[in-house]
C-alpha cells in the first residue's frame, strides 16, 4: 500500500498500550511478513510494557527499565523465514516461519495482561511504514471478565498454536518458552471465562476444550 498518512496518526501503535485496569503484562505474540526489530522493541514493546524511558535520550535508563519490565514477560515475533534476519534482542524471540510453497503474510498480535487480553488484526507489517505511514486496516478483539468475542479469540489462539508447528527454529528453548506463554495465557482466559456471568454454556465448554489442548 503506497498511500501515506500523517505521522501523527498512530492509532495502530496505540493498540499496544494496555487499557485502564489491564494489570501486569503476561506476554505478547505477534506475526508479520516484513519486520523491523528496532521499531518493534522501541515502539510496540515499549508501549505494551509501559516503558517511560526514551532509548535515544536515556540509553542506560531505557535498558534497565526494559530489563526490569521484560523479566517475567514473554515476547515473541513469528516472521516469514525470508525476512527474519538476525537483528534482535536476546530478551525476546524472533521465530522464523517456513510455510511450504507459501509466505507468512498474516498480521495478528496477541497482547495479554493479567486482567485483559487483546487481539489486533491488521494489514500492516511490523515496520515504521506499516504502522506509521501506510494506509492500513486494523481491528481489535477484547477479552475481559465482563465481555469478549470468545469464538474469535479462540480461533486466533488456535492460529498461533498452529503456526508454532511451522517455525523453522527447532531449538527447544524457544519452543518451550512459546508453549509456556500459551499455557499461561490459556489459564488466564479460562479463569475469566468460567468466572464471567451470563455466558452461554457452549462458550464455557469451548474454552474448556481450548484450555485442555493448551496443557497437552
Residues covered by each model-derived region:
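PLD/PLD-like phosphodiesterase catalytic module centered on the HKD motif
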Residues: 1-216
Amino acid at each position: 500500500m503506497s498511500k501515506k498518512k500523517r505521522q501523527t496518526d498512530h492509532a495502530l501503535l496505540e493498540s499496544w498500550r494496555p487499557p485502564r485496569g489491564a494489570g501486569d503484562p503476561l506476554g505478547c505474540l505477534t506475526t508479520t511478513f516484513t519486520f523491523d526489530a528496532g521499531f518493534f522493541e522501541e515502539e510496540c514493546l515499549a508501549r505494551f510494557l509501559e516503558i517511560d524511558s526514551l532509548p535515544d535520550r536515556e540509553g542506560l535508563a531505557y535498558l534497565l527499565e526494559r530489563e526490569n519490565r521484560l523479566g517475567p514477560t514473554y515476547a515473541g515475533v513469528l516472521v516469514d523465514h525470508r525476512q527474519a534476519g538476525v537483528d534482535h534482542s536476546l530478551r525476546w524471540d524472533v521465530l522464523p516461519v517456513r510455510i511450504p510453497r507459501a509466505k507468512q503474510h498474516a498480521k495478528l498480535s496477541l497482547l495479554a495482561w493479567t486482567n485483559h487480553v487483546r487481539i489486533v488484526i491488521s494489514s500492516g507489517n511490523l515496520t515504521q511504514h506499516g504502522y506509521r505511514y501506510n494506509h492500513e486496516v486494523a481491528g481489535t478483539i477484547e477479552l475481559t471478565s465482563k465481555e469478549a468475542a470468545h469464538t474469535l479469540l479462540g480461533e486466533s489462539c488456535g492460529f498461533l498454536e498452529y503456526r508454532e508447528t511451522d517455525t523453522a527454529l527447532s531449538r527447544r528453548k524457544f519452543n518451550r518458552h512459546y508453549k509456556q506463554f500459551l499455557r499461561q495465557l490459556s489459564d488466564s482466559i479460562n479463569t475469566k471465562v468460567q468466572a464471567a456471568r451470563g455466558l452461554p454454556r457452549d462458550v464455557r465448554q469451548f474454552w474448556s476444550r481450548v484450555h485442555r489442548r493448551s496443557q497437552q
